[in-house]
């Protein structure tokens, strides 16, 4: 009996392994089909070079994220210069939650089969040249929250089936769609900007008891006016020159720019209980951050800026705020809106459920688990992607100037979200000496910025490198407490000394309790040292950092740097020789899937 049970157990294990392999192979086949459709040009082949048809699962491939069951949950191929068409085989990824193929050169139609991706939360196909209709099958995606199809060549009518979806974000503007805008379902919450620059008819007005001729004239007038408003709104969005009248808070209109809103002071006073001290989430050099609850029960974080008011700065403030709002990436804190009165400047963000990396490392409540090593790796990658977007993909480059663990926020699934970007410029929009006014936090400020006051994207790279050391050690970038042990008060200097004299484990946060991979720690230290080189020119760009974190080029860059720096740095790098970067892809055990932040800071 015992022997039979053992044999049955073995067969069960073999069967489960077989099922796993079959499932994995199906996913491999689906992604290879996608690669075949998109593999035009050397750049594409390089982007997808790790996609190997001989693999059992695709979970080790670049730009692919899996869950603990080795099921693909995310494809990250935005802004990858891809061309070709989507393939119906994508439906063979049943656990896919995030499909990101935005800002490429993709043509053809959206496959009907995407409607079979029942776990899909976000579909981002914007800024391509996709044609044909929006498939009505997308209406089956009961978990879809983010649908962004704008800046394509889509035609036909908006499927009525989409109105039943629980959408938080919808943007199908700048296409060739026609017909009526549905008025039922979740569509009612979206402004005209979500549908702008199409051939769509506005939502029908209620019938009037006036004579038929007058009614017809009214309808024509409404339609013409709506069309004019659509065009004007689209122009405002593209040119970033929107202007809101600064009226007293009690009379503030509800003004939207896409999903971006001007809030009234009254509703933010109610949301924060008149900026109650018990709602304070944090205080920084830009102002105080409060937790708030809007009338629809949505949690937000409201930053009450402390900058000095000057006459005539309202339009410039609005322009800068709107510029910040246009930076949309899942690793950037999304600006929901603002409030401006003669006496107040406020910014409204989604509430970040898990606070900041700094608070998770050093201020976590008793009973809350420490950030584990896989999460720390994912935070390193996510924050790098967000900064790279600010530097390379915004209409106007945004330099953060204060990259640190306290400004890397974590949503409910511990996805890293870069916060407070754009505020350095926003708070100095009327300062003629902005180029020489040093901003930042001691311990994170790049040496060239400190000495000259001149910043560049390499200033952010330095701050990012120090933030990596915060992730590894759990310590502050500047800490007078280290003087008690005759250690350097600057984290970067302390790390270098420890590398000279002590073992690697002396650096790693004790909160990890030894649960980390030594080679991975070494590689993140290598990355941090490359990013914090004294010469700004020698530091990598954030886009290069992302590529190295994804497994491309760290070993070569590190070897090159060692040859140049060995006479200067007096510690034995050969004691830590591991240069492999396989782990640096988005880790396959990730449960981090949320596309938009929603919680405290």
Curated annotation (Swiss-Prot):
Residues 275-572 form the Protein kinase domain. LRR repeats lie at residues 71-94, 95-118, 119-141, 143-165, 166-188. The keyword Glycoprotein applies. This is Somatic embryogenesis receptor kinase 5. Belongs to the protein kinase superfamily. Ser/Thr protein kinase family. Serine/threonine-kinase of unknown function. Autophosphorylated. Gene3D superfamilies: Phosphorylase Kinase, domain 1 (3.30.200.20), Ribonuclease Inhibitor (3.80.10.10), Transferase(Phosphotransferase) domain 1 (1.10.510.10). Keywords: ATP-binding, Cell membrane, Glycoprotein, Kinase, Leucine-rich repeat, Membrane, Nucleotide-binding, Phosphoprotein, Receptor, Repeat, Serine/threonine-protein kinase, Signal, Transferase, Transmembrane, Transmembrane helix. Interacts with TMK4/BARK1. Residues 25-215 are extracellular. It comes from Arabidopsis thaliana (Mouse-ear cress). The modification Phosphoserine is found at residues 356, 359, 451, 456, 506. InterPro entries: Kinase-like_dom_sf, Leu-rich_rpt, LRR_dom_sf, LRR_N_plant-typ, Prot_kinase_dom, Protein_kinase_ATP_BS, Ser-Thr/Tyr_kinase_cat_dom, Ser/Thr_kinase_AS. It is found in: Cell membrane. It comes from the Eukaryota.
């Amino acid at each position: 009996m015992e022997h039979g049970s053992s044999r049955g157990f073995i067969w069960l294990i073999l069967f489960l392994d077989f099922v796993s392999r079959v499932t994995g192979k199906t996913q491999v086949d689906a992604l290879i089909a996608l690669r075949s459709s998109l593999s035009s040009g050397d750049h594409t082949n390089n982007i997808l070079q790790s996609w190997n048809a001989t693999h059992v699962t695709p979970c080790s491939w670049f730009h692919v994220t899996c869950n603990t069951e080795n099921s693909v949950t995310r494809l990250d191929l935005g802004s990858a210069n891809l061309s070709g068409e989507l393939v119906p085989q994508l439906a063979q990824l049943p656990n896919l939650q995030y499909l990101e193929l935005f800002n490429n050169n993709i043509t053809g139609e959206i496959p009907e089969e995407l409607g079979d991706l029942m776990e899909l939360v976000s579909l981002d196909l914007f800024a391509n040249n996709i044609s044909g209709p929006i498939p009505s099958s997308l209406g089956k995606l009961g978990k879809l929250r983010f649908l962004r199809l704008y800046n394509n060549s889509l035609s036909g009518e908006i499927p009525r089936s989409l109105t039943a979806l629980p959408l938080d974000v919808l943007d199908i503007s700048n296409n060739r769609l026609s017909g009526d805008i549905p008025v039922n379902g979740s569509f009612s919450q979206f402004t005209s900007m979500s549908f702008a620059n199409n051939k769509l008819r506005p939502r029908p007005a209620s019938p009037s008891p006036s004579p038929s001729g007058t009614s017809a004239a009214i309808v024509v007038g409404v339609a013409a006016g709506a069309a004019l408003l659509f065009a004007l709104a689209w122009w405002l969005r593209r040119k970033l020159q929107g202007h809101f009248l600064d009226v007293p808070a009690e009379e503030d209109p509800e003004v939207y720019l896409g999903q971006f809103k001007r809030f009234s002071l009254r509703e933010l006073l109610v949301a924060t209980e008149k900026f109650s001290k018990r709602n304070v989430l944090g205080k920084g050099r830009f102002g105080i951050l409060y937790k708030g609850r809007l009338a629809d029960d949505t949690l937000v974080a409201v930053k009450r800026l402390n900058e000095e008011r000057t006459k005539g700065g309202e339009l410039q403030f609005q322009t800068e705020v709107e510029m910040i709002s246009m930076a949309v990436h899942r690793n950037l804190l999304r600006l929901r809106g603002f409030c401006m009165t003669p006496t107040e400047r406020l910014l409204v963000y989604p509430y970040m459920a898990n606070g900041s990396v700094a608070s998770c490392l050093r201020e976590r409540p008793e009973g809350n688990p420490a950030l584990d090593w896989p999460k720390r790796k994912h935070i390193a990658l996510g924050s790098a992607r967000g900064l790279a977007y600010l530097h390379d993909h915004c209409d106007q480059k945004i330099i953060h100037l204060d990259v640190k663990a306290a400004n890397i926020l974590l949503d409910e699934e511990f996805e890293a979200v870069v916060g407070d970007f754009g505020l350095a410029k926003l708070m100095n929009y009327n300062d003629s000496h902005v180029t020489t006014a040093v901003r930042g936090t001691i311990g994170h400020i790049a040496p060239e910025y400190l000495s000259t006051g001149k910043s560049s994207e390499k200033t952010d790279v330095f701050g990012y490198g120090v933030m990596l050391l915060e992730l590894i050690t759990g310590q502050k970038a500047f800490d007078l407490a280290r003087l008690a042990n005759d250690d350097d008060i600057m984290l970067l200097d302390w790390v270098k000394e420890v590398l000279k004299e002590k073992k690697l484990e002396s650096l790693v946060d004790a909160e990890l309790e030894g649960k980390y991979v030594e080679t991975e720690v070494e590689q993140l230290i290598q990355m941090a040292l490359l990013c914090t080189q004294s010469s700004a020119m020698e530091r990598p760009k954030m886009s290069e950092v992302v590529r190295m974190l994804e497994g491309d080029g760290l070993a070569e860059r590190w070897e090159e740097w060692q040859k140049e720096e060995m006479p200067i740095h007096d510690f034995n790098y050969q004691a830590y020789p591991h240069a492999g970067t396989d782990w640096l892809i988005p880790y396959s055990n990730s449960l981090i899937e949320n596309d938009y932040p929603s919680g405290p800071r």
